[in-house]
Each structure stands twice: as C-alpha cells, then as structure tokens.
Amino acid sequence: LTRSKNEFVPIDPEGKVVKWYSCGPTVYDDAHLGHARNYVTIDVLRRVLAGYFGYNLRFVQNITDVDDKIILRGRQQYLLADFKSKNPTVTDDLINTTIKAFDAYVKKNLPLLSADVNIGTFNEESGKQYANVIQGKSVDGVGPAGDKEAKIKMHLKTAGTAATALLAPSKSTPEDVDIFYAGAEDVLLPYLDSLYGTSIDASDHTVFTRLTQKYEARFNEDMRSLNVLDPDVVTRVTEYGDQIVTFVEKIVDNGFAYSTSDGSVYFDIEGFEKVPGNHYARLEPWNRGDKGLQADGEGALSQQKTSEKRSDADFALWKSSKPGEPAWKSPWGPGRPGWHIECSVMASDVLGEQMDIHSGGIDLCFPHHDK
C-alpha cells in the first residue's frame, strides 16, 4: 500500500504467528514461467520468515476452480472431444467447418488483416500487416513490445498452424488425422463453443472439474519439481459456494452491493466510498479508470453490458448463470461467484478478519487484488 519498505509487525500480540494468504492458480491450463517466478519468489520469502526469523506461519493458498476461463475451456474441450468422435476422418465437411473456424478466429483476433484473407494468403498478409510485431516491436513500430504484442504473436502462431494443417496434402492415415487436429484444434475450440456452448448440460459439473482436477495436479507436480513447499491449507472455490452466498448477502445488507433483475449482484463502489475512511483502488489507484483491466477482471463470459449497473466500474460479486454455465443456488437465483469475491471469502474463513501477508501476481494488482 505504501510502495516503500516498512517494518513488518505481525498482528499476533506475541509476535510469533503470521497469517499468510497466497493467491493461487486458476487451473484451466499448464503453469508457465510467470507462475514459476511468482511461486518460487513467495516460497523463498516464506522460508526466510520461518527458517531465519522463526515465525510460526499459517500459509493458505487457494485454487480457483470456478472462473470464466475454466468454463470456456471445459466446454471447449468437451465439445472438441465430441466433435472428434463424430469426425474420425478428415472429410470435406470437416475441412469446411475448420475453414469457418479459421476465418472466425482471424476476424476476431487479428483485425489488421483484410476481410478476404484465407488459408492460402494468411502467411504473406500477416507477415506484412504484423511485421513490427514479428520483429519484436510494438504494433505501431514506435515503442517496445508488451503484453498486447505477445498475445498477437500467439494468435499469429495459432492461425498459422491451422492454415498449415488445412493446406497439408495428405490427411488420409490415422497419423494424418492426429496431425490435422493438433494443428487445427485451437481455432476449432472457440468456434465449436460459439455454436454449441450454451447447449451443454452444465448441471453436470464434471464437464468442468475434469479440467480443473487435471491442471491442479499438474500445477502441484510442477511446484514440487521446483522444490516449492506445499501450502499448509488449500482452499477451492467449488467447496465454498454456500459461504460465498452468505458473504455476498452481508455486503448487500451493509449497503455496499445491489442485485439486478437478471440475478447478478454488483459491488457498489460509490456507496462504499460514501462511508468516511473507505477508499477503492488502493494498490494501483492510477488504474482505477482503466476499462480494459476492468473488463478483463469481469471475464470473457461477462462482457454483455447491463443498464442496471449503477456504474460501469462496479464489479460482479455474484453472476447469474447463463445456459452452458455451472450454477449454485442463491437468493438471487442460480448463479456462480464473481472472481474477485472468492479469495475474500476463503481467506476470512481460514484466517479470520485480518491477515498479515497477502501475496499474488503483480499483473493482477488491479482489479483483482484490490477487491
């Protein structure tokens, strides 16, 4: 909060117990080097506090296993498996569907390309339109590359790989089919979800837990390979549905949140700040009005605007579940937790009203950690 060095004094009157909450992974994919850097750094600090300073640490780490990314990836993997079972060979129908998927992917993610770009012209045109990015520069060629350019490179690779698979001369053997799907699946995944995602029976939570359990296990394996200590306590969002509902009800009762007609509940930033001493966006106040970060924080499935929000900056504490999304019972109707409220509930349940240390990725300071 102070962005400076301060003396560390535990809440414990005897100065021995340190309560620490570490924001854990959202388990929809494998961990990457950014995760490794984060959790190894936290582990070093944890070992120093316990081993050198002799504090008695209570280290809690969560697993986010309900999230827009998880819902999308779980649905997509389910739909792709079903699609592959119905299309075990590369037919004209499969090719045509994949071309449509390619076109949709390029249109959404690579807007500098012309509307008539196709699998045959993709490499040449993308090389021209995104030359600066390919050369390691910013899109406009003025400044250095950043996160935006990294995502563009990912999209270029995905589309290029799919184009190569579609242009491959032979697709007849089982090995050819495997190679085709390996190259095309990243454009097929979002396309199939756009067609059939809302038709999935989301009451069957195994569509999603099959994904999260797999990647939680892989994350733990990676951390142990890096010699990162296991948490003392692990919490999972799926195990906290009732507590989250109760927590949100208290916020509504306190006058800091409101429900909308679709069954969602939003935090009322203006109402919160009307109370003397309450301030919002303490970690990165300069990002308070960043609509891009706000949208990222709300998730890919929550981009539809509602006129009932009192402010565009108000964020979801509880989201009404749409077709194809998992749901839990609540006073506002079937829904699921908003991303930002989850850690508040789990941390307070295990550690109480106050904690000594809260750690997590710097990229999520605003809006996630500020909630």
Language-model features, listed with the residues they occupy:
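NTP-dependent nucleotidyl-transfer catalytic core
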Residues: 1-371
